[in-house]
Amino acid sequence: MRTFVLRARAASTHSQTLLANVGGDAHSEILAHTLMNAIFVAQSHRDDVVVHLVLESTQDYSRTITFVAAEMRDIGGFHEQALLAKVVRALDASAGMGKEQMKAVESGITVRTQSFEKVVKELAEDGHQLYMMDPKGENIRELDFAQKPCFLLTDHIPMPKKSFNSLKRLGTEKISLGPTMLFASQCVVLINNELDLAGF
């Protein structure tokens, strides 16, 4: 199983604000693009992928929307609008939830009022090896992947420096995809390809 966590610091937890920011400063479309490249392949989808989208622009609590590819049904199409509709449905379902609550949205999709820090801590405690993108990290092609790899990505707003120490305590390893700074959705394509080539 391969896991991706996208920390979307600019993405609104209010569904209509999120949609209004597609193509805007918050770049809400990154959520759909990352989902698309993590889950779909030509004429099919990957069953071995879990994606956690952590939306942090909020009036109350962050929202973590989890997509378990193997359990998803009626995805609705390989395009931005269909995938954003899934995110919107999850956000609408989360309205009024208290802190650290969870709700099933539909088959394969859940939403939690949970922070990025809490999500990655739980993943680490569950045996996932955390990997964070860093131009100075170990070249991904020289990496011996752990059995439960989890890749941490961000939107256009970099990871806060204060997060680095907590991630380091969780055993996070820094890896590099090359010298060029890429979008999260592009990173996902390269990571999936490297895992495929490694026979993962």
Curated annotation (Swiss-Prot):
Highest taxon of the lineage: Bacteria
Family according to the record: Belongs to the methyltransferase superfamily. TrmY family.
Entry EC number(s): 2.1.1.-
Binding site for S-adenosyl-L-methionine: 133, 187
Xref: InterPro entries: Alpha/beta_knot_MTases, TrmY, tRNA_m1G_MTases_N
GO terms of molecular function: S-adenosylmethionine-dependent methyltransferase activity; tRNA methyltransferase activity
Pfam families: Methyltrn_RNA_2 (PF04013)
Compartment(s) of residence: Cytoplasm
An annotated GO BP: tRNA methylation
Protein name per its UniProtKB record: Putative pseudouridine methyltransferase
CC annotations in GO: cytoplasm
Organism: Alcanivorax borkumensis (strain ATCC 700651 / DSM 11573 / NCIMB 13689 / SK2)
Keyword tags: Cytoplasm, Methyltransferase, S-adenosyl-L-methionine, Transferase
Gene3D superfamilies: 3.40.1280.10
